[in-house]
Amino acid sequence: MRGVKLPRLVPSRPVPPPPAAPGEVLAAAGGLRVHLGGRPVLDGVDVEVRAGEVLALVGPNGAGKSTLLGALAADVPAAEGVVRVHGRPVSDWSAPELALRRAVLPQSASLSFPFAVEEVVRMGRAPWAGGDRADEDEAAVAEAMARTEVAGFAGRPFSALSGGERARVALARVLAQRAPLLLLDEPTAALDLRHQELVLRLCRERARAGDAVVVVLHDLALAAAYADRVALLRSGRIAAGGPPSEVFAQGLLSEVYDQPVEVFPHPRTGALLVVPHRSP
């Protein structure tokens, strides 16, 4: 209409979430049911993810661990129940707002173009473009590459890396994002012993710094050593939840995994060790 001045649409600047208090719930699922391919995958799951803690999702193949992680990330829709991030249903957040609040590491990472390692890590800074923290980009990228030990091949094409190297670059991207909620799906799966320990130490460090970390693990000894709490899944439900010392009971694990196991403390550290029972 002539004479009417229309408002200029200016993209909003990213606003970071306020610092979380220790123990604050940064993500939660209540009565969560998820169907994939017409079949139920999660059935009535309740879980909370708290600032300052590492929560490990464990359980046999097909138990629903990755699906639960995807639901907490707002990447997998709920058929019933609610998923909240920073106190609000995930549907209330826009994609850019979610990207400031949670960072996600999928099981596998692949790229169609020959991006260099540093370019891949820099992708983690995309949510902050145009915001007050954009000036942190260089430091965030450099720190993430150093912590994951990928700085030595920063210029190499991502597609030319080994599986373990790709996994560490993908983790560096997540760390560079500097979101207060980290959702990591099997981050140690392709790694050697040394780098498995490196990744879990980074998880603990992020939790000590006040972040909330959710990690899907198959190695129960790693979960016992590094997680504050574990959620043991079986057939789409949480069979038990709590500190590893409470959940990792020999009888329960043997039943859930349908495999006899032995649980005993490490003779020096006291950390729980879980090993399959083997006949002599």
UniProtKB/Swiss-Prot annotation:
Gene that specifies this protein: hmuV
PROSITE patterns (alphabetical): ABC_TRANSPORTER_1, ABC_TRANSPORTER_2, HMUV
Topology within the bilayer: Peripheral membrane protein
Descriptive protein name: Hemin import ATP-binding protein HmuV
Species for this entry: Streptomyces coelicolor (strain ATCC BAA-471 / A3(2) / M145)
ABC transporter domain location: 26-260
Enzyme nomenclature, EC number: 7.6.2.-
Coiled-coil residue spans: none
Gene3D superfamilies, per the entry: P-loop containing nucleotide triphosphate hydrolases
Free-text function comment from the UniProt entry: Part of the ABC transporter complex HmuTUV involved in hemin import. Responsible for energy coupling to the transport system.
Superkingdom of this protein's organism: Bacteria
Subcellular location(s) per record: Cell membrane
